[in-house]
């Protein structure tokens, strides 16, 4: 109901557009980048995850520019839900973040009581995840205009 759209198969001719040469790489880029970062850097895993999901999202965006609007909106929608969830946690358990998160291992920046890294993670997850179905299944969005 948010996007008022239906899915339709992508025509075979479109599947062979130059951008789609990177279709498989786009789909597997996030886990590959995440594994490389986890094994070769001392970054906190949440930073590695954010970097991998953003790069994977942009790889999907390059391959499937028709999903750009959906990806951005989905990133913000998931971020909104995540904020509501965290606000509830912070209101019910005021010291929860300080007790559970190792803020010294993060930036220490809290936005309305939520670690900034959590907000970046939420946006990057929604941004990437929203393109997976259409990309993996070779589906196009057919917008409904009423």
Where are these regions (language model features)?
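Aromatic-rich, lipid-facing transmembrane alpha helices and their immediate juxtamembrane interface loops
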Residues: 1-146
